[in-house]
Amino acid sequence: IVGGSEATSGQFPYQXSFQD
């Protein structure tokens, strides 16, 4: 799992707009 600056509503912070 790579750490991004955008925390999502999913499980992990991704390097993009990942809405789970």
From Swiss-Prot:
Catalytic activity field: Hydrolysis of proteins, with broad specificity for peptide bonds. Native collagen is cleaved about 75% of the length of the molecule from the N-terminus. Low activity on small molecule substrates of both trypsin and chymotrypsin
Annotated EC = 3.4.21.32
Lineage: superkingdom: Eukaryota
Family listed: Belongs to the peptidase S1 family.
Give the top-level enzyme category. hydrolase
Q: Does the keyword Cytoplasm apply?
A: no
Name the source organism: Paralithodes camtschaticus (Red king crab)
**Phylogenetic classification of the source organism:** Eukaryota, Metazoa, Ecdysozoa, Arthropoda, Crustacea
Q: Which residues form the Peptidase S1 domain?
A: 1-20
Task: Specify where the region named Disordered lies, as residue ranges.
Answer: 1-20
Which keywords has UniProt assigned to this entry?
Answer: Collagen degradation, Hydrolase, Protease, Serine protease
Name the UniProt record assigns to this protein: Collagenolytic protease 36 kDa C
Extract the coiled-coil ranges from the record.
none
